[in-house]
């Protein structure tokens, strides 16, 4: 671990097309091999499809989807006297949002067929409606934390 000062956290600028910080974060998670314009086009196309299907504001639906997929608690492994315990811990807001975006992208990629934009649009709409794999993953994470509540005193 570095002995120098902690790195200064750079502010995330809002996406130029949607004027939204979450959209910028999503583009970064969608991007593969530095192809940012491709990732931006995928997000833009997905938002277009969401707008067509719902008739509402796609950015609002996107924010709702991220909020619904964001975990509040997670379990982390902690070794105590030769045994490894799954210790439930609260998730900071930035980490929770990052996890939600990562899950949304990963589960979109895992969906069947069609273009990435269609898969992403489907996953976002499902998440906004409290359904979909990303929301199921959040519920699973919360259940794990609830089941291991007895080890909460091992928090670090």
Curated annotation (Swiss-Prot):
Full protein name: Small ribosomal subunit protein uS7
Record's subunit section: Part of the 30S ribosomal subunit. Contacts proteins S9 and S11.
Function comment: One of the primary rRNA binding proteins, it binds directly to 16S rRNA where it nucleates assembly of the head domain of the 30S subunit. Is located at the subunit interface close to the decoding center, probably blocks exit of the E-site tRNA.
GO CC aspect terms: small ribosomal subunit
GO BP terms, alphabetized: translation
Phylogenetic lineage: Bacteria, Bacillati, Cyanobacteriota, Cyanophyceae, Synechococcales
InterPro entries the record matches: Ribosomal_uS7, Ribosomal_uS7_bac/org-type, Ribosomal_uS7_CS, Ribosomal_uS7_dom, Ribosomal_uS7_dom_sf
Annotated PANTHER family: RIBOSOMAL PROTEIN S7 (PTHR11205)
Record Gene3D superfamilies: Ribosomal protein S7 domain
GO molecular-function term, one example from the UniProt record: structural constituent of ribosome
HAMAP family membership: Ribosomal_uS7_B
Keywords: Ribonucleoprotein, Ribosomal protein, RNA-binding, rRNA-binding, tRNA-binding
Pfam families linked: Ribosomal_S7
NCBIfam families: rpsG_bact
Family stated for the protein in its record: Belongs to the universal ribosomal protein uS7 family.
């Amino acid at each position: 671990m570095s002995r120098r000062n902690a790195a200064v956290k750079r502010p995330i600028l809002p996406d130029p097309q949607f004027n939204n910080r979450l959209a910028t974060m999503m583009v970064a998670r969608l991007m593969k091999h530095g192809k940012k314009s491709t990732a931006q086009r995928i997000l833009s196309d997905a938002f277009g499809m969401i707008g067509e299907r719902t008739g509402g504001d796609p950015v609002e639906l996107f924010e709702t989807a991220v909020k619904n997929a964001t975990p509040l608690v997670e379990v982390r492994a902690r070794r105590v006297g030769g045994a490894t315990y799954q210790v439930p811990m609260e998730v900071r807001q930035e980490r929770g949002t990052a996890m939600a975006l990562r899950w949304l992208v990963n589960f979109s990629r895992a969906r069947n067929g069609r273009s990435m934009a269609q898969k992403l649009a489907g996953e976002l709409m499902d998440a906004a409606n409290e359904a979909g794999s990303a929301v199921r993953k959040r519920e699973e994470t919360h259940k794990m934390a609830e089941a291991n509540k007895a080890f909460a005193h091992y928090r670090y």
